[in-house]
Amino acid sequence: MDPAMELTERKFRHWCRLVESHSGIAVSDCWADFARRRMVEHQSFSRQPEGGREHLQALVDRLLIKETRFFRHPPSFNYVASVLSGDSDVPESDPQSEPPSGFSLWSVGCASGEEAYSLAMLSEQLCQAGKLSSPFRLLATDLSRSALDIARCGEYPRSRLRHLNAMQHAWFESAGDKFLRVRATLKKRIVFARHNLLDSLPGKTFDVIFCQNLLVYVAPTRRKMLLEKLA
């Protein structure tokens, strides 16, 4: 018998509701089988919700697929570059103005850090080109503790960086035969922190908010609310 069948439909839906109320993550039909198996693996379905917050958080961590890579979806990063450099058609930008000083960025749902480090590399490149004034700061947040541990460590398999160009590769140093490590000069630009978007927002404003990894997990009815909250 398929072990995932041991989880009754009623119990499965109950845990889906708990997960969404805790994290905003909606288990849609297209990945319900995956979620069932993760619940069985974690044995969370057999626990009472009272006093089980840590077990619920661990389940949420299992459900987050954490699919990401450096400079994922290049058009998004190209647009950020145009905004930072004042070359976009955003009304607030002024091509004749001085480069922004003290620029701040927020990577929402940064997963294992590739997105945040990509934004940092892009910003450093613009600084070196005189299109953005240092220092800039970057906040990178995620709900997954395990993903944030990887992000803070900043070590990635060499195979994950093969598509980067020479300028981007220069921000890494060797960490053994199979891994590369983000250099401290780039890492110090980023603060990694655990954050749930259902909670209050960080107590500051940001010039750029990047959230392309996040909305896939959120129910359509909640997406508009979150986007308005971020705006």
Residue ranges and their predicted role:
Residues 78-88, 116-127:
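Short, well-ordered amphipathic alpha-helices
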Residues 43, 123-127, 155:
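Conserved hydrophobic residues forming the short capping helix/wall of the S-adenosyl-L-methionine
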Residues 108, 129-210, 214-222:
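Extended basic-aromatic, gly/pro-enriched interface segments that bind polyanionic ligands
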Residues 25, 66-70, 112, 199, ...:
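Short strand->helix junction
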Residues 98-119, 136-139:
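Conserved class I S-adenosyl-L-methionine
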Residues 224-231:
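A short glycine-rich, Lys/Arg-flanked "PGG" loop and its adjoining helix->strand segment in the class I
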Residues 2-106:
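Conserved AdoMet
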